[in-house]
């Protein structure tokens, strides 16, 4: 999913095919989002800030779309309050790549050809368990037991789900249809783009505190 050199030509071909497909398919391919369930409640969200200091998260990953499948190992180096570098390594030593997220910006060596394969920043932060979508005056929240759901904004709508104060799901909804989403269940994280049938799954194997990272890792 990130700009590893070994598959860059495949990514460009996939992007061309996907752009033509989307021209005809459009938003209609995505499933309807439906309405929120539960009882109306004030829109007060749990705190999801990145833990103070630095973390090193190791994971297995697998990426699949209509023309490409790849898997390997990865490392996320996280620095509070709002910075993460994601490194992806293909199995078999076939290459690798990275993406840097600082606040609401993404940088990757693959440029626009690769960036189109990345989720929006808000969904990338949801992968890390952080809600990066500010509440708006028209936010609607509902509660059902220990599950809190809320719709934030209008077209796109960001639908967030918390279970016992933990962010477990974030969806991007446009014109009433769920275009893409991230879900978190224990050590498993999944990103799905409904229009282009793209998915990225992560299996977190370890999370450890780390000393401050070399400033060079944030150089773009």
Locations of regions flagged by a protein language model:
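Sec-dependent bacterial lipoprotein signal peptides
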Residues: 1-29
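N-terminal leader/targeting segments and the immediate start of mature chains
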Residues: 28-80, 111, 118, 211-220
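N-terminal beta-strand/beta-hairpin edge segment
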Residues: 60-65, 70-106
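Residue-level recognition of conserved beta-strand positions in structured domain cores
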Residues: 88-90, 110, 172, 193
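A short, polar/proline- and glycine-enriched secondary-structure boundary/capping micro-motif
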Residues: 95-103, 118-121, 179-182, 200-203
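Gly/Pro-enriched, hydrophobic low-complexity segments
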Residues: 141-220
